[in-house]
Swiss-Prot record:
Record-stated family: Belongs to the ubiquitin family.
Residues carrying the site annotation Essential for function: H68
Positions bearing the Glycyl lysine isopeptide (Gly-Lys) (interchain with K-? in acceptor proteins) cross-link: G76
Covalent cross-link (Glycyl lysine isopeptide (Lys-Gly) (interchain with G-Cter in ubiquitin)), residues: K6, K11, K27, K29, K33, K48, K63
PROSITE patterns: UBIQUITIN_1, UBIQUITIN_2
Domain Ubiquitin-like span(s) in chain numbering: 1-76, 77-152, 153-228, 229-304
Residues flagged as site, Interacts with activating enzyme: R54, R72
Protein name as annotated: Polyubiquitin-B
Quaternary structure and partners: Interacts with SKP1-KMD2A and SKP1-KMD2B complexes.
Keywords of this entry: ADP-ribosylation, Cytoplasm, Isopeptide bond, Membrane, Mitochondrion, Mitochondrion outer membrane, Nucleus, Phosphoprotein, Repeat, Ubl conjugation
InterPro entries, sorted: Ubiquitin-like_dom (IPR000626), Ubiquitin-like_domsf (IPR029071), Ubiquitin_CS (IPR019954), Ubiquitin_dom (IPR019956), Ubiquitin_ubiquitin-like (IPR050158)
GO cellular component, as recorded: cytoplasm; mitochondrial outer membrane; nucleus
ADP-ribosylglycine modified-residue sites: G76
Organism: Equus caballus
Length: 305
């Protein structure tokens, strides 16, 4: 169908659209015709500003309807919302928008109900009734979105300085996920984090429930041990596994770490470095394996000896 888009200069643009087109699609068509970037466009119909993720039919826009195109409102700005999966969502907001408004925009774009959203900025959880300007959130600021899923719980992470960090987690979260949450809150790279609970160092590929970590449990966060280093293990499929090790770790220890991450029993693993097969009882330093060295993992097929 055809619709019309009228600009403030009085110009009328004719567009070919489908009722199922999103507002985002329409803005892209306007960009193609007129060269106006979508992030500078606001479309108004029946007195309402149209949200990118909605469709024309959602707004009952029919053939030969006229939309009004205005420039971004004064004070309008873009902010970014980053999810734990690494996806970044771009939102058009005003400094006077409440956190509740922002959650509604996220719901429009991503379908996540506001009551499952927690927004974090500068390490603080944002309260619904406050505005972006209350928190000094400015253009191109990045908020972090964490989901309050059913079964969610709080745990505490205590640092060596005595600071306690509160995290929203699921029993099914891996230690790797928890390290990503700490990075979001505190800026500490995951490869510098080691978690201790009940006297044990926690392995990245395991879950909180594997370690019987329950609501309001306290983990201890320590920096990588002196001498700690990363090495890489490359499989025949081309996958590369990153491991945290010590030079004093035995090949047996390394195989146990690979089992934790990948589920491959140690007796099916053969590790090769510099053309040599590594023996279980030897250490990494025996073989002069240093930080960021790459080992090759080959599987010992059934029937092999």
């Amino acid at each position: 169908m055809q619709i019309f888009v009228k600009t403030l200069t009085g110009k009328t643009i004719t567009l070919e659209v489908e009722p199922s087109d999103t507002i985002e699609n329409v803005k892209a068509k306007i960009q193609d015709k007129e060269g106006i970037p979508p992030d500078q466009q606001r479309l108004i119909f029946a007195g309402k500003q149209l949200e990118d993720g909605r469709t024309l039919s959602d707004y009952n826009i029919q053939k030969e309807s006229t939309l009004h195109l205005v420039l971004r409102l004064r004070g309008g700005m873009q902010i970014f919302v980053k999810t734990l999966t690494g996806k970044t969502i771009t939102l058009e907001v005003e400094p006077s928008d409440t956190i509740e408004n922002v959650k509604a925009k996220i719901q429009d774009k991503e379908g996540i109900p506001p009551d499952q959203q927690r927004l974090i900025f500068a390490g603080k959880q944002l309260e619904d009734g406050r505005t972006l300007s209350d928190y000094n959130i400015q253009k191109e600021s990045t908020l972090h979105l964490v989901l309050r899923l059913r079964g969610g719980m709080q745990i505490f992470v205590k640092t060596l300085t005595g600071k306690t960090i509160t995290l929203e987690v699921e029993p099914s979260d891996t230690i790797e996920n928890v390290k990503a949450k700490i990075q979001d809150k505190e800026g500490i790279p995951p490869d510098q984090q080691r978690f201790i609970f009940a006297g044990k160092q926690l392995e990245d590929g395991r879950t909180l429930s594997d370690y019987n970590i329950q609501k309001e449990s306290t983990l201890h966060l320590v920096l990588r041990l002196r001498g700690g280093m990363q090495i890489f293990v490359k499989t025949l499929t081309g996958k590369t596994i990153t491991l945290e090790v010590e030079p004093s770790d035995t090949i047996e220890n390394v195989k146990a770490k690979i089992q934790d991450k990948e589920g491959i029993p140690p007796d099916q693993q053969r590790l090769i470095f510099a053309g040599k097969q590594l023996e279980d009882g030897r250490t990494l330093s025996d073989y002069n394996i240093q930080k960021e060295s790459t080992l090759h993992l080959v599987l010992r097929l059934r029937g092999g000896c």
